[in-house]
């Protein structure tokens, strides 16, 4: 049952060994330490707004200095209750306060019910974890209609009635006669879960602690322990005789602590309050699926906070207008989720507390809540230098504004076309650089979080790519649902394709902007020096970078990852920051920097020889574009475990490269290989390094060749059409009458489809290609493949400039996307390049198929709203692959699914 913020909401135990030298004491007997005089550069904490002594103890253990009660400039401000928006607006960038504006949209019972109802209408299968709820008096009529339907079916249900903004179990009652409820009061009526999961015949709920460190971008952490709060009377299904026995039906600590049967125990596995850590072990001992249990809990939490995100982000932006995108969030929040389990162990959300109780009446409260607070403050990364850096940054920005630096000139009405193009290009470059800074800041933040998670784990953004895509889809739906008709700029920002791009993708776009800038300025085009595939040439500049990287990594390979040394450095004031400067020691960053600050290519130097470095002979190098299984070779002959290839596969590839591309493209993976220690895991001294590289290269080429043939066999068709009515004839018909269709396709792609819809069209191709790569390369995560990274760069180029990248492929030249490989240090082989060419052709076919379906549907009157880009695709085109032997077609599913299947092109696949 729900429990109220600000009250002793006592919950279960997890014995964290944070500091065993601080024995548990009841909050009434804890003595506050006398703080020494404030030192310069110390981290200050203003805790006058809390009544919980455990908060003060944790700040002291973190070595924070207690600020004066009236000090509004402290690094940390803690309040038990929600704070006014004006106070958040007045905070400086180095400060942190423990509440977000707008979080009441899920923490008030009536707001939670209202927002969940809206999301259930949009995503009923995803939001099925909250009991059916009505808000009185607004939904009184709907409730009475529901009661009448139950009577017709001769069914009777129990309902729980709560005050809309109540707490601590006050005003809660149960009823089985819904028709007797009155509409005057502001109440929340909810279906009662009659068959809960029981512990020793007692009903219970879980208090899950959640930390939100940022809303822009959203970052959520789940604490791996919490409290199990049990009723104090054995549970029986609700009936007219026991509806008033609240000690049986309610699990609130504030209610049950008054019962004489309430058991206070100093251990975590007995009493009326226990730890979730103990509960997890209990489930494991009884053969329950622990992994599924925690995944369900995490899923519930993330989906609930996705409902809050549009409200919170909008309110936060209103409080902090003009804040730099790379600035740290001044708000964080520790939330208490109250969750109940049914008999099938499915979690159901009861309520969310934005000010969960941090009272410590029992040892279990002290252990769990101290860990929640201590680990949360460590994750916030509050540093003494933040204040000084913030003041310096403010001064620099003030000087910029004073001298007019950093701001772009405005165009006059009389500006020429050249000036307009130049202005658009400069704006694009500024946008890309800003997003690049955000991505690098996010990478730095993630690296810090991974080192200081403690007993937390990050549940958003998740590591699983498919799960992240699902959550991003729900997030987009939430923004469309809750911010419809307002916050247009915020919605445009959420739909910006740059938000989903990685660092290397943004660097590619920046490089393209540099090339466009050169063309616009009339600079001579750079010569494209041919490179020989067999020799794998590398520039002397690249060799120098690689040597510096190797020596640096070897000298820092010991001790750099030691947590104790990091903490010592922090104590000495040497705050370790992850730098992503373009001149960083990492070779990958150096490689990317050469793409932005381009220089004419140097003469190719000889590649490394085994004799040039004594240590390199014993080391094993693995190509970053090849699955790990390829290099796990044994002493057997390489021909024994190679799969046979048909004559078609062994035949030469005859499609020529288009445009100015030549067969000089080589593999970038050779320059990215980093020597590994000779003593690492699976090194086979019987295979020389050159032999291993040769085998790896051969297998990569074979797998790339298989990928190319698989892509050539892919055909797109419109669902609902027979296999004979393959879409290819429709596409040919459009291309034959291109003069007629050109303007219509352009209007459809560039105007009617927004950026989200354009990405959905190309995602049809992307999803099927992922399945092909997973099948051929035998890897589940294709992100590690060099060829897939090349595909991603092509996809991003096709979506560039609001879809102009793909549209330019319909022109006579149609090779503008090839420029992303021209001067990139990541070199592509001819076969990989032909795969990219086939990918572009599939994207063009997919667009024409979607356009054809939209046109036919509109003419037939099947989908009158198809042209409105607000609507989702009613039907998604499918890809088929023909087997050369059987000729049977197998179509993929419509959106990303792990079960997409293709008929194998050859039996040995």
Curated annotation (Swiss-Prot):
Compositional bias annotation for Low complexity: 548-562, 604-625, 658-673
Binding, ATP: 162, 168-169, 190-193, 203-205, 251-252
The reaction(s) this protein catalyses: L-glutamyl-[protein] + L-glutamate + ATP = gamma-L-glutamyl-L-glutamyl-[protein] + ADP + phosphate + H(+); (L-glutamyl)(n)-gamma-L-glutamyl-L-glutamyl-[protein] + L-glutamate + ATP = (L-glutamyl)(n+1)-gamma-L-glutamyl-L-glutamyl-[protein] + ADP + phosphate + H(+)
Main location per the UniProt record: other
TTL domain segment(s): 40-392
UniProt: Mg(2+) 2 binding residues: 351, 353
Compositional bias (Polar residues): 532-542, 626-657, 674-688
Documented EC number(s): 6.3.2.-
Residues the entry annotates as binding Mg(2+) 1: 338, 351
MF GO annotations: ATP binding; metal ion binding; protein-glutamic acid ligase activity, elongating; protein-glutamic acid ligase activity, initiating; tubulin-glutamic acid ligase activity
Amino acid composition bias (Basic and acidic residues), ranges on this chain: 518-531, 571-580
Assembly behavior: Interacts with both alpha- and beta-tubulin (via C-terminal tubulin tails).
Domain commentary: The enzyme uses its core to engage the disordered anionic tails of alpha- and beta-tubulin and the flexible c-MTBD (cationic microtubule binding domain) region to bind the microtubule and position itself for beta-tail modification. The c-MTBD region is positively charged and becomes ordered when bound to microtubules: it interacts with a negatively charged patch on alpha-tubulin. The presence of positive charges in the c-MTBD region is essential for proper binding.
Protein name per Swiss-Prot or TrEMBL: Tubulin polyglutamylase TTLL7
Lineage of the species this protein comes from: Eukaryota, Metazoa, Chordata, Craniata, Vertebrata
């Amino acid at each position: 049952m729900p429990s109220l913020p600000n009250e002793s909401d006592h919950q279960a135990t997890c014995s964290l060994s944070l500091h065993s030298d601080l024995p548990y004491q009841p909050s009434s007997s804890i003595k506050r330490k006398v703080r020494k005089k404030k030192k310069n550069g110390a981290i200050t904490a203003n805790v006058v707004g809390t009544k919980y002594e455990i908060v003060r103890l944790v700040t002291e253990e973190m070595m924070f200095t207690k600020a004066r009660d009236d000090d509004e400039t402290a690094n940390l401000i803690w309040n038990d209750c929600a704070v006014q928006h004006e106070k958040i607006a007045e905070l400086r960038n180095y400060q942190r306060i423990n509440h977000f504006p707008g979080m009441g949209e899920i923490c008030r019972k009536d707001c939670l019910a209202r927002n969940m109802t809206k999301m259930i209408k949009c995503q009923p299968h995803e939001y099925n974890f909250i009991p059916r709820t009505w808000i009185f008096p607004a939904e009184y009529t709907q409730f009475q209609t529901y009661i009448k339907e139950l009577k017709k079916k001769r069914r009777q249900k129990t309902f729980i009635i709560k005050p809309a903004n109540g707490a601590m179990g006050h005003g809660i009652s149960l009823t089985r006669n819904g028709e007797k409820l009155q509409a005057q009061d502001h109440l929340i009526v909810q279906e009662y879960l009659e068959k809960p999961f029981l512990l020793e015949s007692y009903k219970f709920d879980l208090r899950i602690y959640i930390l939100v460190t940022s809303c822009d971008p959203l970052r959520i952490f789940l604490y791996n322990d919490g409290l199990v709060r049990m009723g104090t009377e054995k549970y029986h299904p609700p009936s007219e005789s026991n509806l008033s026995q609240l000690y049986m039906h309610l699990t609130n600590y504030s209610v049950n602590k008054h019962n004489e049967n309430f058991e206070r125990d100093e251990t975590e596995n007995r009493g009326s309050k226990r730890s979730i850590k103990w509960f997890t072990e209990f489930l494991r001992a009884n053969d329950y699926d622990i992994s599924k249990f925690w995944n369900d809990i995490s899923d519930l939490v993330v989906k609930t906070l996705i409902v809050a995100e549009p409200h919170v982000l909008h309110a936060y932006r209103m409080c902090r207008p003009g804040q730099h995108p790379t600035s740290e969030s001044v708000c964080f929040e520790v939330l208490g989720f109250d969750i109940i389990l049914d008999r099938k162990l499915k979690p159901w959300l009861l309520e969310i507390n934005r000010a969960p109780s941090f009272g410590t009446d029992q040892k279990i409260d002290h252990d769990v809540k101290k860990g929640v607070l201590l680990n949360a403050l460590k994750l916030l990364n509050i540093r003494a230098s933040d204040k000084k850096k913030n003041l310096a940054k403010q001064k620099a920005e003030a000087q910029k504004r004073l001298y007019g630096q950093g701001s772009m000139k405005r165009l006059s009405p009389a500006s020429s076309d050249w000036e307009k193009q130049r202005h658009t290009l400069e704006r694009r470059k500024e946008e890309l650089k800003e997003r690049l800074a955000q991505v690098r800041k996010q990478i730095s933040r993630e690296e810090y979080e991974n080192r200081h998670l403690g007993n937390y784990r990050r549940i958003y953004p998740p590591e699983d790519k498919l799960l992240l895509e699902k959550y991003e889809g729900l997030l987009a739906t939430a923004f469309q649902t809750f911010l419809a008709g307002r916050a247009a700029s915020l919605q445009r920002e959420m739909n910006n394709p740059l938000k989903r791009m990685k660092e290397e993708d943004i660097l590619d776009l920046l490089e393209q902007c540099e090339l466009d800038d050169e063309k616009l300025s009339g600079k001579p085009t750079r010569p494209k020096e041919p490179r020989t595939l067999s020799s794998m040439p590398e520039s002397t500049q690249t060799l120098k970078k690689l040597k510096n990287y190797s020596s640096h990594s070897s000298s820092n390979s010991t001790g750099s990852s030691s947590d104790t040394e990091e903490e010592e450095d922090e104590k000495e004031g040497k705050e370790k920051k992850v730098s992503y400067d373009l001149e960083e020691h990492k070779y990958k960053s150096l490689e990317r920097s050469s793409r932005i600050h381009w220089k004419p290519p140097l003469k190719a130097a000889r590649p490394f020889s085994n004799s040039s470095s004594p240590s390199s002979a014993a080391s094993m190098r693995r190509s970053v574009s090849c699955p790990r299984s390829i290099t796990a070779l044994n002493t057997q002959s390489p021909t024994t475990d190679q799969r046979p290839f048909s004559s078609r596969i062994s035949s030469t590839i005859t499609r020529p490269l288009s445009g100015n591309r030549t067969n000089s493209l080589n593999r970038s993976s050779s320059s990215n290989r980093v020597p590994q220690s000779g003593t690492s895991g699976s090194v086979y001294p019987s295979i020389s390094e050159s032999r291993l590289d040769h085998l790896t290269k051969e297998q990569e080429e074979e797998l790339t060749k298989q990928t190319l043939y698989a892509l050539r066999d892919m055909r797109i068709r419109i669902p609902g059409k027979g296999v004979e009515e393959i879409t290819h004839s429709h596409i040919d018909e459009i291309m034959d009458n291109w003069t007629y269709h050109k303007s219509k396709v352009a209007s459809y792609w560039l105007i009617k489809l927004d950026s989200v819809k354009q990405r959905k069209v190309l995602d049809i191709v992307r999803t099927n290609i992922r399945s092909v790569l997973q099948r051929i390369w035998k890897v589940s995560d294709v992100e590690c493949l060099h060829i897939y990274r090349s595909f991603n760069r092509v996809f991003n180029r096709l979506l560039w400039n609001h879809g102009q990248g793909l549209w330019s492929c319909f022109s006579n030249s149609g090779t503008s996307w090839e420029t992303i490989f021209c001067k990139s240090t990541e070199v592509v082989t001819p076969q990989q390049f032909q795969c990219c060419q086939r990918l572009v052709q599939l994207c063009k076919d997919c667009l024409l198929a979607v356009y054809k379906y939209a046109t036919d549907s509109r003419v037939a009157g099947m989908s009158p709203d198809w042209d409105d880009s607000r609507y989702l695709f009613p039907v998604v085109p499918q890809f088929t692959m023909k087997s050369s032997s059987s000729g049977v077609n197998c179509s993929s599913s419509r959106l990303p699914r792990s079960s997409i299947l293709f008929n194998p092109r050859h039996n040995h696949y």
